[in-house]
Design a protein with these regions (language model features):
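Non-catalytic DNA-recognition/assembly elements of restriction-modification systems
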Residues: 1-26, 34-48, 143-185
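Short secondary-structure capping/turn segments at boundaries of alpha-helices and beta-strands
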Residues: 25-29, 53-56
Length: 185
């Protein structure tokens, strides 16, 4: 039996607001933004929501290690992304700021659980502050059957990361070795 199988866990609904504070992005005049080094996250369905890089001047800067949630957008409504670095958010995106110490792997797992529900949202039914407060996600239960199993979520996402990265790392190593043997390295 695979101890990291999602099917082998008991699950329970939790409110997003149990674990996150919410803050809506405030960049709404995209044409006036000057180019810089601060990532700008918009309601895109690709590229982790990154639209470009803007100047930090007079911008609300959100810290990294949070989730962003597309409120509406180009088919991306309901998609959640883990954001590792500081960023600016456009007005079609909400920041989900952890209330407690959630790490990268916890946030990746929760973003996956949120995104699984994205079909509920779209231009006719966007995410707003009331819907965010009422938003529930299913999470695996810990041994106490009351709280989420954060350790399981971390181990599950670490394994996923390893499985996804391993082929790319092996390919890169082969290229580097090949380049070293044939010269030019």
């Amino acid at each position: 039996m695979d101890k990291l199988s999602l099917k082998n866990k008991d699950w329970k609904y939790f409110y997003l607001s149990d674990f996150f504070d919410f803050e809506k992005g405030n960049q709404n005049n995209m044409a006036s933004l000057s180019t810089g080094t601060l990532p700008l996250v918009s309601a895109k369905k690709t590229d982790n929501g990154y639209k470009g890089f803007v100047s930090k001047e007079q911008k609300k800067v959100f810290r990294g290690e949070i989730l962003t949630l597309n409120n509406d957008g180009d088919g991306g409504a309901g998609i959640a992304y883990y954001q590792p670095t500081s960023m600016a958010l456009d007005s079609h995106v909400s920041a989900l700021i952890p209330k407690s110490n959630l790490n990268k792997y916890h946030l990746l797992f929760v973003s996956m659980c949120i995104t699984k529900q994205r079909k509920r949202f779209g231009h006719g039914y966007s995410i707003n502050s009331n819907r965010l407060r009422a938003f529930k996600i299913m999470l695996p239960l810990g041994a106490d059957y009351a709280n989420p199993d954060w350790q399981f979520m971390e181990e599950y996402m670490r394994r996923k990361e390893t499985l996804l990265l391993k082929p790319a790392v092996e390919k890169l190593c082969k290229r580097l070795i090949h380049k070293e043997i044939l010269g030019g390295g």
